[in-house]
Amino acid sequence: MAVQVVQAVQAVHLESDAFLVCLNHALSTEKEEVMGLCIGELNDDLRNDPKFTYTGTEMRTVAEKVDTVRIVHIHSVIILRRSDKRKDRVEISPEQLSAASTEAERLAELTGRPMRVVGWYHSHPHITVWPSHVDVRTQAMYQMMDQGFVGLIFSCFIEDKNTKTGRVLYTCFQSIQAQKSSESPRGPRDFWSSSQHISIEGQKEEERYERIEIPIHIVPHVTIGKVCLESAVELPKILCQEEQDAYRRIHSLTHLDSVTKIHNGSVFTKNLCSQMSAVSGPLLQWLEDRLEQNQQHVQELQQEKEELLQELSSLE
């Protein structure tokens, strides 16, 4: 029985530069949820090892050892462009999934590693970090295509009532099939409980799902990867494109009068200025500071190189 019920993923290792991009994206807007896809690889090499072919009680021990190595490594993320901006809902279009798969293939060729889309992330502004019933349902549908697919949630713009300071919470989860309601001895569960029972549209009523929390670890890096740096720079462009799409969609309506169009143009300009102040400005300052640090580090390395060369020449 222990071999049949196997947890798809035991842990997630998120690179610190990818975590930085996710955090910047989540903090870019306070009114709507944002979303992106995670690119990485699933470490399950031992599962296909021919030496794990035991049976009976011994198989259970070996299976448990194999399961412990199923770790998702997230190396970079792809920021998605929202076609429909809502406060409590965000979705992935098939076109975006296809584009993300193409990008993962490009990264696989570039790095020589089996990169693919391994998960998705989205933000929860002003609400709990735990996934809603819609999140659990969406995650279950993704896992029907890939059992190793994981979901990340970043809860931001949360204020601690005691210290009056803001904080950001994050979690990683998957969906698993829950027990039938007839087998559960307990009564109704809390809406945000980890034992929440969810029905999937189009499935039988007894096929319910609940979330399971996946341990997530941030892997520190001294430098920032090129792919993550490109994603961070791409964020202001994507936000600007979203505002342009929304403005053009409203501006194309024929029944609007001149005053309304002028008002809409003013709102569009205001939103762009807000983005420049909240996203583009701090990002530019951070890049300039990072460049200055890198230049200083290069000077230190050059000085160290000269000192080592002098020591080497003195030994000769």
Curated annotation (Swiss-Prot):
One of the GO biological process terms: protein K63-linked deubiquitination
Family annotation (Pfam families): BRCC36_C (PF18110), JAB (PF01398)
Entry annotated with the keyword Cytoplasm: yes
InterPro entries: BRCC36_C, JAMM/MPN+_dom, JAMM_MPN+_peptidase_M67A, MPN, MPN_BRCC36
Residue positions where Phosphoserine is found in the record: 258
Enzyme class: hydrolase
Location of the protein in the cell: Nucleus; Cytoplasm; Cytoplasm, Cytoskeleton, Spindle pole
Domain of life: Eukaryota
UniProt keyword annotations, A-Z: Acetylation, Cell cycle, Cell division, Chromatin regulator, Cytoplasm, Cytoskeleton, DNA damage, DNA repair, Hydrolase, Metal-binding, Metalloprotease, Mitosis, Nucleus, Phosphoprotein, Protease, Ubl conjugation pathway, Zinc
Annotated S-S bridges: none
Gene Ontology molecular functions: cysteine-type deubiquitinase activity; enzyme regulator activity; K63-linked deubiquitinase activity; metal ion binding; metal-dependent deubiquitinase activity; metallopeptidase activity; polyubiquitin modification-dependent protein binding
CC cofactor: Zn(2+)
Enzyme Commission designation: 3.4.19.-
Textual note on the cofactor: Binds 1 zinc ion per subunit.
Binding annotation for Zn(2+): 122, 124, 135
Keyword tRNA-binding: no
Motif (JAMM motif): 122-135
Chain ranges of the MPN domain: 12-179
Residue list for modification N-acetylalanine: 2
GO cellular component: BRCA1-A complex; BRISC complex; cytoplasm; nuclear ubiquitin ligase complex; nucleoplasm; nucleus; spindle pole
Stated family: Belongs to the peptidase M67A family. BRCC36 subfamily.
Quaternary organization: Component of the ARISC complex, at least composed of UIMC1/RAP80, ABRAXAS1, BRCC3/BRCC36, BABAM2 and BABAM1/NBA1. Component of the BRCA1-A complex, at least composed of BRCA1, BARD1, UIMC1/RAP80, ABRAXAS1, BRCC3/BRCC36, BABAM2 and BABAM1/NBA1. In the BRCA1-A complex, interacts directly with ABRAXAS1 and BABAM2. Component of the BRISC complex, at least composed of ABRAXAS2, BRCC3/BRCC36, BABAM2 and BABAM1/NBA1. Identified in a complex with SHMT2 and the other subunits of the BRISC complex. In the BRISC complex, interacts directly with ABRAXAS2. Identified in a complex with ABRAXAS2 and NUMA1.
Purpose: Metalloprotease that specifically cleaves 'Lys-63'-linked polyubiquitin chains. Does not have activity toward 'Lys-48'-linked polyubiquitin chains. Component of the BRCA1-A complex, a complex that specifically recognizes 'Lys-63'-linked ubiquitinated histones H2A and H2AX at DNA lesions sites, leading to target the BRCA1-BARD1 heterodimer to sites of DNA damage at double-strand breaks (DSBs). In the BRCA1-A complex, it specifically removes 'Lys-63'-linked ubiquitin on histones H2A and H2AX, antagonizing the RNF8-dependent ubiquitination at double-strand breaks (DSBs).
Name this polypeptide is given: Lys-63-specific deubiquitinase BRCC36
Organism: Bos taurus (Bovine)
